[in-house]
Amino acid sequence: MSQEKKVFKTEWAGRSLTIETGQLAKQANGAVLVRYGDTVVLSTATASKEPRDGDFFPLTVNYEEKMYAAGKIPGGFKKREGRPGDDATLTARLIDRPIRPLFPKGYKHDVQIMNMVLSADPDCSPQMAAMIGSSMALSVSDIPFQGPIAGVNVGYIDGKYIINPTVEEKEVSRLDLEVAGHKDAVNMVEAGASEITEQEMLEAIFFGHEEIQRLVDFQQQIVDHIQPVKQEFIPTERDEALVERVKSLTEEKGLKETVLTFDKQQRDENLDNLKEEIVNEFIDEEDPENELLIKEVYAILNELVKEEVRRLIADEKIRPDGRKPDEIRPLDSEVGILPRTHGSGLFTRGQTQALSVLTLGALGDYQLIDGLGPEEEKRFMHHYNFPNFSVGETGPVRAPGRREIGHGALGERALKYIIPDTADFPYTIRIVSEVLESNGSSSQASICGSTLALMDAGVPIKAPVAGIAMGLVTREDSYTILTDIQGMEDALGDMDFKVAGTKEGITAIQMDIKIDGLTREIIEEALEQARRGRLEIMNHMLQTIDQPRTELSAYAPKVVTMTIKPDKIRDVIGPGGKKINEIIDETGVKLDIEQDGTIFIGAVDQAMINRAREIIEEITREAEVGQTYQATVKRIEKYGAFVGLFPGKDALLHISQISKNRIEKVEDVLKIGDTIEVKITEIDKQGRVNASHRALEE
């Protein structure tokens, strides 16, 4: 990489974009500093000296949000950044997906992309800056990379598409789309949307691609100026004689029939047996310790299996489980299978099964998000778990990994647009989707299961949502789009395109591909085929439960809303929270108070709610002119008596207002503790209350 500082500038969505090279992190293979508005991201690319054994490309993308970038000190005892949060993990995945397909086939060196957010401007996306930084760090390095790529955020407001909308614009946008690609094609899409049509989504994707092309041209100019010298990478060539011999054995032993085993576990077992038989043929003839030969035979076998699966789909239109390209696996749905939970849905599609379980909580049970932007209170959460037994395997039980976090977030994005507002449903909602079986499309099964759980729980959702995953097999001059892909089609195909939505439109999409990019024609056809599949699944789900239940579970908390004047909030809270804690301790409820005076009272027992409401009403009660009260004498003065109308509110009963008859001394007719009926005659500007008993006698 060049050691001389160079600065390159352009404009991006009305803001300055600057890329600097040659000054920072010079021991990395490639490093750039990206300045976008007031956002600053350092992106580096580093590769290992030697390749790694194995049949996968060891690429790692990291995205680190430094709290100092937003002028914050991290919370917690240690006061330093810990492991990446969910948003940082999702951004790392977002950057990984468009970059990964653009490395040479067979490249096995460890590659690590590091993105450090050094300064964060909420209106100048650090995520998109990091994507460009990652592309540039690779492009100016000696690492072989077939980029550059770029990514943009697209919004949709009042029928117009916007590149990189501001925080304020995102709040009113019907679309939050991230799209990435290179000059010739799109190779990554991720979006959440408010029932966007397929055509609107298609236009948004390619509106974004126009800006991507300009950004790629800008990066290419930088590369041409720097002229990095790339590592020479020569892929390992197969022994063609060995390939032909292994291929002949697979045909002899019935590879086609083995692939066309409809049951996943049986197919996997049959393929393992076939591979073992063929490998044994070579072990019998060669040195049994010749591990290199055995590895080579296994690698050839894996390639031949992939080629056969793709040939069957592309040429014979037969899928491994016997389905047609647009056919969905058998469906089954159930609700209400867990008696003590607040809502549950079981969704099964072929050999993929998800159990989604819903819990309702008070508004105070929200998740607090404290990242580089303002603190956010999240009242809808979807979590996804993928245990080892779901694919018949054993292994250590760990905290959720990147994949589980990503699938959970995709489901959350697909469902959040149908969740009712706080005013209509004052609850925090958490759904956990447990994948019990998996043979592909488990994230979409979790979306379907979650919709069932929402309706089973009685959540008044705006519309049901279903999800489906689309696949793709390309040939030189043709392509085949697959509906509802299974695991083998995902692993050996060219695309995993997940689409979720209602009957009216899309609420979330996510596209991963293993080829350079997709044309407009393929994306358009995939979206339409996904729409038909989504509606078929939706119709099945609605046969199980067609609308939300009218009542919540008996075990769900009840939430009652009441409103007080904002200036009374401090009375309910009390000094240092004393009064509100007393209410909670006495009644056992959860209290959430909004700044506008709205109070949410939550508890399982209605009697607890009623008692809390009574206490709050007593605290916030106000005297009204013309109303009568049974008052208690609290203090006597020469000029009258102070009487208590209700807790926290006293009134002056002037001596002239005690009786229509003349009174010399207050003590002649009243003593402390006496009860007397009074009428409120005046409340002055300072809130002082004057009362009269005489007015009731006249």
Curated annotation (Swiss-Prot):
Gene3D superfamilies (alphabetical): GHMP Kinase, N-terminal domain, K Homology domain, type 1, Nucleic acid-binding proteins
GO molecular-function terms, A-Z: 3'-5'-RNA exonuclease activity; magnesium ion binding; polyribonucleotide nucleotidyltransferase activity; RNA binding
Bridged cysteine pairs (disulfide): none
EC number(s) given by UniProt: 2.7.7.8
Residues annotated to bind Mg(2+): D490, D496
InterPro entries: ExoRNase_PH_dom1, ExoRNase_PH_dom2, ExoRNase_PH_dom2_sf, KH_dom, KH_dom_type_1, KH_dom_type_1_sf, NA-bd_OB-fold, PNPase
Entries under CDD domains matching the protein: KH-I_PNPase, RNase_PH_PNPase_1, RNase_PH_PNPase_2, S1_PNPase
Catalytically driven reaction(s): RNA(n+1) + phosphate = RNA(n) + a ribonucleoside 5'-diphosphate
Domain KH, first and last residues per copy: 557-616
Cofactor annotation: Mg(2+)
An example Gene Ontology CC term for this record: cytosol
GO terms, biological process: mRNA catabolic process; RNA processing
Signal peptide coordinates: none
Keyword annotations: Cytoplasm, Magnesium, Metal-binding, Nucleotidyltransferase, RNA-binding, Transferase
Subcellular localization(s) per the UniProt record: Cytoplasm
Stored Pfam families: KH_1 (PF00013), PNPase (PF03726), RNase_PH (PF01138), RNase_PH_C (PF03725), S1 (PF00575)
Domain S1 motif, chain residue ranges per copy: 626-694
Role of this protein: Involved in mRNA degradation. Catalyzes the phosphorolysis of single-stranded polyribonucleotides processively in the 3'- to 5'-direction.
HAMAP family: PNPase
Alphabetical list of PANTHER family matching this protein: POLYRIBONUCLEOTIDE NUCLEOTIDYLTRANSFERASE (PTHR11252), POLYRIBONUCLEOTIDE NUCLEOTIDYLTRANSFERASE 1, MITOCHONDRIAL (PTHR11252:SF0)
Family the UniProt entry places it in: Belongs to the polyribonucleotide nucleotidyltransferase family.
Protein name: Polyribonucleotide nucleotidyltransferase
Name of the coding gene: pnp
